[in-house]
Swiss-Prot record:
The keyword Cytoplasm applies. This is Thiazole synthase. 1-deoxy-D-xylulose 5-phosphate binds at G156, A182, G183, N204, T205. GO terms for molecular function: thiazole synthase activity. The gene is thiG. Pathway: Cofactor biosynthesis; thiamine diphosphate biosynthesis. Belongs to the ThiG family. Pfam families: ThiG. One of its GO terms (biological process) is thiamine diphosphate biosynthetic process.
Length: 254
């Protein structure tokens, strides 16, 4: 069981709502993934109609919604988006995203830390999306973040765990849950992230852009479960030398 703030999750696969070809396909894929937390950008919601085709079905499903501040270019804009989400969605949970560079979507560490402190002081449950920077993740813990979400590789790139060395350090040092976010492109990569000791992974593009998102969602669900089970079972030590599994010379003395 994964616990973030006061909320418990059976599934350690978190998902997103972007890039699906239709709202119905998105909902079916999320159901197939068995995910219990879904992130969505406030800028994508149609708040004027009073009945958004994405929001309403998700609310009715009972899945935990994690509004994100994607599109915010600085701390001020991110705080505004979070406060809007709290008012409209009646939740104090927020995935903090600040990426002023529209080409590579790299998160701004300085603005993110400033916004995180402000939001934590305002009573938000903050899950910041950041570079895989162990020092920054410690600072975010110190200001009160409920979890940290270091990137595996650039958003939507499907490059996998390009930051593995730093993810290991973050996982080792963290006293809050570590959710590996962005860049996970295959179920095997999700398994590996969980084998490292990550508490959860967030996957969107790899599911939504696949030929069969529903089947891919099931694959990721199974992959995350397998990776977590392997981590709990205790992985064997890696050695540069061969280690025999049975005696090599004992039979000569018989």
């Amino acid at each position: 069981m994964l616990k973030i703030a006061e909320h418990e999750f059976n599934s350690r696969l978190f998902t997103g709502t972007g890039k699906f070809s239709s709202a119905n396909l998105m909902l079916e894929a999320i159901q197939a993934s068995q995910s219990q937390l879904v992130t969505m950008a406030m800028k994508r919601l149609d708040l004027s109609s009073g009945s958004d085709e994405i929001l309403l079905p998700l609310q009715q499903s009972g899945i935990k919604l994690l509004p994100n501040t994607s599109g915010a270019r600085n701390a001020k804009e991110a705080v505004f988006a979070a406060e809007l989400a709290r008012e409209v969605l009646n939740t104090n949970w927020v995935k903090l995203e600040i990426h002023p560079d529209p080409k590579y979507l790299m998160p701004d560490p300085i603005e993110t830390l400033a916004a995180a402190k402000t939001l934590c002081d305002k009573g938000f449950v903050v899950l910041p999306y950041v570079h895989a920077d162990p020092v920054l993740c410690r600072r975010l813990e110190e200001v009160g973040c409920a979890a940290v979400m270091p990137l595996a590789s650039p958003i939507g790139s499907n490059q996998g765990l390009a930051t593995e060395t730093f993810l290991k350090i973050i996982i080792e040092q963290a006293s809050v849950p570590v959710v590996v976010d962005a860049g996970i492109g295959t179920p095997s990569q999700a398994t590996h992230a969980m084998e490292l000791g990550a508490d959860a992974v967030l996957v969107n593009t790899a599911i939504a852009s696949s030929r069969d998102p529903i089947a891919m969602a099931r694959c990721f669900s199974q992959a995350v479960e397998t990776g977590r089970a392997a981590y709990r079972a205790g992985l064997g030590q890696v050695s540069v030398r061969a280690e025999h599994t049975s005696p090599l010379t004992g039979f000569l003395n018989e």
